[in-house]
A protein has these predicted regions:
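Secretory/exported precursors with cleavable N-terminal leaders
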Residues: 1-205
Length: 205
């Protein structure tokens, strides 16, 4: 994992020694801003989150970027390098909680924002931050309708003749944003065994 993610994720936080079969997928991205932030302009300020306020190193710059605004959201698109890729930053209107914002973006607000982007001079204040995320994907996959893979109905005969089931399916991600750009990595792994995940269905005889 460390080699594939350039050291962002050194090891996965899950024992797989007893798994009969392991599936592993890695992603890595590193992009430099087209217009970098000046570290001398970074200073500690208050960031107002959904539940609390925290002091963070806040980056400042005035640059031309993609910009869009609706009654519910404001968005800025910051390009990397030759502008083949960009980061879209979305700020919900005051008083909007994250769950409500997430539902709105999934229901079409994201598409509306991206269709409204236009070039503008923008005064930017962006936190310098690092995030780490580790979660099981089993519940999410089951909510999407994937059930057999975690039960006695699983059929992986194309991979192995053994009657195996997914007993772990996890993802670990890291995101870093600073004055130079963005670095991100993700590792998704699944372990198959003859045992079932907690709460899984019993094998069908």
């Amino acid at each position: 994992c460390s080699e594939k993610t350039e050291g962002c994720i050194r090891e996965i936080d899950c024992p797989l020694a007893d798994a009969q079969l392991v599936m592993l997928h890695t992603l890595y991205f590193k992009g430099a801003w087209t217009d970098k932030f000046d570290p001398a302009q970074t200073r500690t300020e208050t960031f107002r989150g959904n539940l609390r306020e925290v002091a963070v190193p806040m980056m400042h710059d005035r640059q031309r970027a993609g910009y869009a605004a609706t009654e519910s959201f404001t968005a800025v698109s910051l390009p990397y390098g030759n502008e083949a890729y960009s980061m879209l930053l979305v700020l919900p209107a005051a008083g909007t909680d994250m769950a409500q914002a997430g539902r709105a973006l999934a229901d079409g607000a994201w598409k509306e924002l991206t269709s409204r982007l236009y070039g503008a001079q923008v005064d930017l204040k962006l936190p310098k931050f690092e995030l780490a995320y580790d979660t099981s994907l089993i519940e999410m996959l089951q909510e999407m309708g994937i059930h057999d893979a975690f039960s006695g109905e699983a059929d992986f005969s194309g991979l192995t003749p053994d009657p195996l089931y997914f007993n772990v399916f996890k993802q670990q991600s890291v995101l870093r944003v600073d004055e130079r750009g963005t670095e991100a990595a993700s590792v998704t792994w699944a372990g198959l065994d003859t045992s079932l995940p907690e709460g899984g269905e019993e094998p069908v005889a």
